[in-house]
Regions:
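FAD-dinucleotide binding site
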Residues: 2-491
């Protein structure tokens, strides 16, 4: 009891809601300073990391966040109903895996431990042709697609291994690969192209919030190549798998503890409810106009999702290539739907809670239970075409469709949760989708080289600008660190 009175211990043990209140209380309440060395736009993980690194260099920093909270695409949800044990689940980015060294280091520094995603037992595959099967491994044992899928995934790995993660557009085949969608390439190279594409949708819908027909092949190869670090080549399985993959672990208490603890340390560097409306560069400085006032800075780091950058009024105008890039980057469409049960009953049946369905609302399903194992939580990623079909339905109809998808995998008990929670990222004004902004065909080769290129005194962060683990929390950390280095070198 007595030790918890110490501020440090108390801060470390605060849950999401209490930390959120503490961050809001510690953030800047009054007028903004008229001048700063650097302004960071965006209070997601990337912006917070950039602000911390700049402050560590001794710079006077102001961080402007549009929302009344920090975390961006990382968001905890606190369960409060009977039988839920007050558990926390993640409505946004959640997973961490091998080679995601930068987010791992940050979490360790902030005292946020990880736990293994439950992975004991079999996964479930539901096919509209062959019915329900239990399996182990990466690819379901569907005889109509397995030979094709194995060959194509091997080819994806070998093509991705040739990609320069810092300049994917420089590959000799870049123009050819960027001219086609992943879906077109699959159909051209598989005997059962439709079947393989249907399976790959169960990877692209959660991972990109998009379908194979929307994504440039070059972009997808780069995304796979990014699924590693400086000493480990990215592979499809490291991106898609649980064991030894990007879904291997989660954070105890939920991933939003990381940005919340980071923001609490930054104190009044953080200003909430301060959407940036105009950025003008003149006379060797940058004027940042926000809803909370104007700040003059020597440098600015923009760490907002690419589509939102278009909503800022720029003077002078953004360079043509940067403007075209932003216009061609589309946020994925994604929502997360969680059903909560008193226990993870599927584990009793020897199942790990992971499932793939080639149709319906619940195409890709994970065990989203907290570390303690209770309550049991099943999570469906509803993305891309599946979001377009089910995202428009009334909540009750969508809930029924998701639960029916769970029941097809795990039995009738899945129809009777004690709670149901959903979060539609397309409805978030300051994100507009998720989990990442994607490259349509023809975008990367023509405009991709602008992604990190500073614009005068403006630098770019955000997970989309990372050369490793783009689209992930690790990419967000890396991008924030890189942007801070750029600013430090150009003071």
């Amino acid at each position: 009891g007595g030790a918890s009175a110490s501020g440090l211990v108390l801060g470390a043990s605060l849950g999401t809601d209490a930390l959120h209140d503490a961050v809001a209380a510690a953030s800047r309440q009054g007028a903004l300073p008229r001048r700063a060395d650097a302004v960071v736009v965006g209070g997601g993980i990337s912006g917070l990391v950039a602000a911390r690194e700049l402050a560590r260099k001794g710079l006077d920093v102001v961080l402007l966040e549009a929302r009344d909270r920090v975390g961006g695409r990382v968001l905890n949800h606190h369960l409060s109903g009977p039988g839920t044990h007050g558990a926390t689940i993640e409505s946004g980015g959640a997973f961490i895996g091998p080679t995601q060294d930068h987010i791992a280091r940050l979490a360790k520094e902030l005292g946020v431990p990880t736990f293994l995603e439950y992975n004991q037992g079999n996964s479930v595959y539901v096919s509209s042709l062959t019915g329900r099967q239990e399996y182990s491994g990466t690819v379901p044992p569907d005889p109509t697609i397995l030979p094709d899928a194995a060959v194509l995934l091997q080819r994806i790995d070998s093509m991705a291994a040739e990609i320069d993660v810092a300049a994917p557009w420089s590959h000799p085949n870049a123009a050819e690969w960027d001219a086609q969608t992943l879906g077109e390439w699959i159909r051209a190279n598989a005997v059962n192209g439709d079947g393989v594409e249907n399976l790959i949708e169960c990877w692209t819908q959660p991972g990109f919030g998009a379908d194979p027909n929307e994504l440039s092949l070059l972009y997808v190869l780069w995304y796979v190549a990014c699924s590693g670090n400086e000493s480990n080549v990215g592979t499809f399985s490291r991106n898609s798998d649980t064991a030894n993959g990007a879904q291997e672990r989660r954070f105890v208490g939920g991933s939003q503890l990381i940005p919340l603890r980071l923001a609490r340390k930054l104190g009044d560097i953080v200003t909430l409810r301060a959407p940036v409306r105009r950025i003008e560069q003149r006379d060797g400085e940058v004027l940042v106009h926000s809803a909370r006032g104007v700040v003059r800075a020597r440098r600015v780091v923009v760490a907002a999702p690419p589509p939102l950058v278009l909503g800022i009024d720029w003077f002078p105008r953004l360079p043509a290539r940067r403007l075209q890039l932003l216009r061609h980057l589309d946020m994925g469409q994604l929502m997360k739907c969680d059903a909560v049960y008193r226990t993870p009953f599927w584990r009793e049946a020897g199942l790990n809670g992971f499932g793939i369905n080639d149709s319906g609302a619940a195409r890709a399903v994970f065990d989203n239970s907290p570390k303690e194992g209770e309550p049991g939580v099943l999570l469906a990623f509803v993305g891309g075409d599946t979001w377009r079909q089910y995202g428009v339905l009334p909540r009750a109809e969508r809930r029924r469709a998701v639960l029916e998808g769970f029941a097809a995998m795990f039995g009738e008990r899945a129809l009777h949760p004690i709670d149901y929670v959903e979060h539609d990222w397309t409805k978030e004004r300051w994100t507009t989708g998720g989990p990442v902004a994607n490259y349509a065909p023809g975008t990367m080769v023509r405009f991709g080289s602008a992604i990190r290129k500073p614009f005068g005194r403006v630098h770019w962060a955000g997970t989309e600008t990372s050369t490793y683990w783009t689209g992930y929390m690790d990419g967000a950390v890396r991008a924030g660190e890189r942007a801070a280095v750029e600013v430090g070198e150009r003071r």
